[in-house]
Amino acid sequence: VVVTISHLNYIKRTNLSEYRRQSRGGKGSKGSDARDEDFIEHLFVATNHNYMLFFTEKGKCFWLRVFSIPEGTKTSKGRAIQNLINLEPGDKVKAFINVPTLSDEDFINNNYVIMATKKGIIKKTTLEAYSRPRQNGIIALTVREGDELLSVCLTNGQQEMLMALRSGRAIRFNESTVRPMGRGASGVRGVTLADEETDEVVSLICVDPNGTSDI
């Protein structure tokens, strides 16, 4: 199936067969009936048995099986994510990861969740820590006052982190320099901001240390 998530956090799954193949250079086809202020921000292919882990700006984690995401047509808007999980008032989803399994012991103990906050804090936790869901979510990160969770990525333990700042600077380092922590930990300094009042992390991506593609 194809899972789409919009800028305003509307989500749906659609049968892959609705996206027919077209010739290169064509006009494409309409993929959503989003409102003017909304647009498709994420689109990926998954199986119905994959898991979606959602992370909120206050540091909580919720998960859904892909088959429990409401099915829609290619042009439908989808359902608001906050209607599918028990978000606290004032909290909102900031990041997500698509996970193929949470039952394979080897996979969940050798893959990691990397989180970054706006104030430059980074945290690494084994995927195993997120393999037992609760209806009201679980703590993924203890967010310090004045900060919020920004980005999350799934890694294999050997990738490199690239954090970009609003000031135009960026830092790259191997994830092996960040030790795994428990879910309740608040993380460690990943990058020092140029100015605590005006600078902030705007993006975190995880890259293959031997990769040669452009970022």
Feature annotation, model-predicted:
Residues 1-215:
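Short, structured "edge-of-domain" segments at secondary-structure transitions
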